[in-house]
Amino acid sequence: MARYRGAKLRITRRLGDLPGLTSKIAKRTSRPGQHGAVQKKPTQYGIRLEEKQKLRFNYGISEKQLMNYIRQAKGIKGTTGTILLQLLEMRLDNLIFRLGLAPTIAAARQLVSHKHIQVNNTRVSIPSYQCQPGDVLSVRDNAASKSLVNTYLESPSLSQSPQHLDFDKKNLTAKVLGIVDREWVALKLNELFVIEYYSRKI
């Protein structure tokens, strides 16, 4: 399944607040579609599917990528759902978004892809790059990169950076202090339902 490039507010009307997808708020609160205003009792499968879709659309990843992350999470000691969220949260594009250097994860992905971002003083152009504690993230020292990021910094963003990131706004650098705690994940969802959705697929 390819990455979604359609109307973002249509997705948030169906799935709820997805901070990584858009900060805009839909004026219409009913679900999209001809029968969107009709309240239907959700099935257990439907509930789990919806939680999975929240994860995909918020982080901007494909079905194949999500399945790979779940396989990876299952191979790490600990609670699989929490580890899955930590893997997604420690992606470079997500950290750039959480720092407020981009208004959405999609915008952060472009910053990384266009080589505006450095990790430990080395340009990294892979949005899915898995950051580690001790890594130092920075904006390239050129006028174009800094101008673009400063414009983004003026846009509304999440209220505060999570505690595992130490951000120097003046110098546009940040240090990764550790792995994100579950409580600092901005997306509201039940990750256990996501793991249950894939239980027979992986």
From Swiss-Prot:
Entries under Pfam families matching the protein: Ribosomal_S4, S4
Principal place of residence: plastid
Annotated GO MF terms: rRNA binding; structural constituent of ribosome
InterPro entries membership: Ribosomal_uS4, Ribosomal_uS4_bac-type, Ribosomal_uS4_CS, Ribosomal_uS4_N, S4_RNA-bd, S4_RNA-bd_sf
GO cellular component: chloroplast; small ribosomal subunit
A biological process term (GO) from this entry: translation
Localization terms from the record: Plastid, Chloroplast
Domain S4 RNA-binding positions: 90-152
Key words of the record: Chloroplast, Plastid, Ribonucleoprotein, Ribosomal protein, RNA-binding, rRNA-binding
Domain of life: Eukaryota
Function recorded in the entry: One of the primary rRNA binding proteins, it binds directly to 16S rRNA where it nucleates assembly of the body of the 30S subunit.
Homology family: Belongs to the universal ribosomal protein uS4 family.
Database matches in NCBIfam families: PRK05327.1, rpsD_bact
Oligomeric and partner information: Part of the 30S ribosomal subunit. Contacts protein S5. The interaction surface between S4 and S5 is involved in control of translational fidelity.
Protein name as it appears in the record: Small ribosomal subunit protein uS4c
